[in-house]
Swiss-Prot record:
The lineage of its organism: Bacteria, Pseudomonadati, Pseudomonadota, Gammaproteobacteria, Enterobacterales. It is found in: Cell inner membrane. Belongs to the LysE/ArgO transporter (TC 2.A.75) family. It is a multi-pass membrane protein. GO terms for cellular component: plasma membrane. InterPro entries: Arg_export_ArgO_enterobac, LeuE-type, Lys/arg_exporter. It comes from Salmonella newport (strain SL254). The chain crosses the membrane at residues 1-21, 37-57, 68-88, 111-131, 147-167, 179-199. It catalyses: L-arginine(in) = L-arginine(out). One of its GO terms (molecular function) is L-arginine transmembrane transporter activity. The keyword Transmembrane applies. Involved in the export of arginine. Important to control the intracellular level of arginine and the correct balance between arginine and lysine. This is Arginine exporter protein ArgO. Keywords: Amino-acid transport, Cell inner membrane, Cell membrane, Membrane, Transmembrane, Transmembrane helix, Transport.
Length: 211
């Protein structure tokens, strides 16, 4: 059964490593050393719920509800455009230290709300967990399925805590004005690129619904 664990771990790692909204948010919180371990835990727990739902049968709900998929997609587009705009606005600020200080003033609950939006309004999360993992893990018998899910969940926990701790460790180098400007530009551009990609997918979904 251990082979199913490592299959799940490898697939989970492959899906979570690319830079996306979740990773960017965890990295920034790590650099700020602001509730970064709490955010890593909440991201990993969110993945645990989504992965379990996808592998143990929840994928059918998404696949059979095109309007739900469309709603999640356009909600994700709106959020990513807003999130990217905020990052670019901070990067282009004439007083980057003041802009960064304003971000640091955000309370715990606002940070948690942003994390939940970053996770649950990202349609790619549902495609990864419900479609990819659901189609692969759903074919397995119950015992191998459990090991496969455990491997995928382990990759998520290891990655988010590793990213948060690494970012916090590198914080003295990454907190400089130049580094912060580069990071915010990178995050903003990536968020907008993902948003435009999702918008194209959303248009295709809407076209399919009305034809």
């Amino acid at each position: 059964m251990i082979s199913y664990y490592f299959q799940g771990f490898a697939l989970g790692a492959a899906m979570i490593l690319p830079l996306g909204p979740q990773n960017a948010f965890v990295m920034n919180q790590g650099i700020r050393r602001q509730y970064h371990l709490m955010i890593a835990l909440l991201c990993a727990l969110s993945d645990l719920v989504l992965i379990s739902a996808g592998i143990f049968g929840g994928s059918a709900l998404l696949m059979q509800s095109p309007w739900l998929l469309a709603l999640v997609t356009w909600g994700g587009v709106a959020f990513l455009l807003w999130y990217g705009f905020g990052a670019l606005k901070t990067a282009m600020s004439s007083n980057l230290e003041l802009a960064s200080a304003e971000v640091m003033k955000r309370g715990r609950w606002k940070i948690i709300a942003t994390m939940l939006a970053v996770t649950w309004l990202n349609p790619h999360v549902y495609l990864d967990t419900f479609v990819v993992l659901g189609s692969l893990g759903g074919q397995l018998a119950m015992e191998p399925k459990r090991w496969f899910a455990l491997g995928t969940i382990s990759a998520s926990f290891l990655w988010f805590f590793g990213l948060a701790l690494l970012a916090a460790w590198l914080a003295p180098r990454l907190r400089t004005a130049k580094a912060q400007r580069i990071i915010n530009i990178l995050v903003g551009v990536v968020m907008w690129l993902i948003a435009f990609q999702l918008a194209r997918e959303g248009v295709a979904h809407m076209h399919a619904l009305f034809n």
